[in-house]
Amino acid sequence: MAPWSSLYRYVLPDTPGCPELVVDQNLRQAAIDFLRDSGAYVVNVPAFAYTADVSAYTHAPAADTQLSGVIEARVAGQTHSMQLGTPSIAYNARTALYPSVFIAGDDNINFTLWPTPTVSGTLAYRYSAYPTQTAATVPDIVVAQWADAIARGAKARILALPGKSYTNAKLASLYEQQFRATINRAKILRQRGALTAGTRVRFWPFGV
């Protein structure tokens, strides 16, 4: 994990006189917007054991991050259908014996395996995340891949602040356009599985 100061060199030269605290706040918000809207930060969670006759499990996202969405879940090595929420009688009757993983929660990732497993096995999953509003750090891989994009988002916000020595509405608008364009590019790369060399990231919407 990298501190926000690791991104200063992309921001401070273009925002002279801006306090570092303000830079931190706007870098954080830019990172939140970028990763939430693009899904570009994907965490692959190694398989963990589940036990027979126990259907509910809870995991916490990585430090300083919060869940954006679960992309894929594999139970006993097989990809399962994912649904948002919890199982219902109507769903159970409609899909008799079709295996599903139900996802719920914000601060934690709550899984419900349905039908309840009758034997022990493993569950592995991958999810997208973004920084919390109090995050003091950002994942290293995000800095390596998207430092310039996040910096442009931060500069757009900083330069749009009214009445400051560094206020520049025209440049702020340009940076905002570039920031949004890069979000769209990152979203496409994620859907194509091209974000990280050697790692395939498959887009799997809820309910499929």
Predicted regions and their residues:
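Glycine-enriched, solvent-exposed interface loops adjoining structured elements
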Residues: 1-208
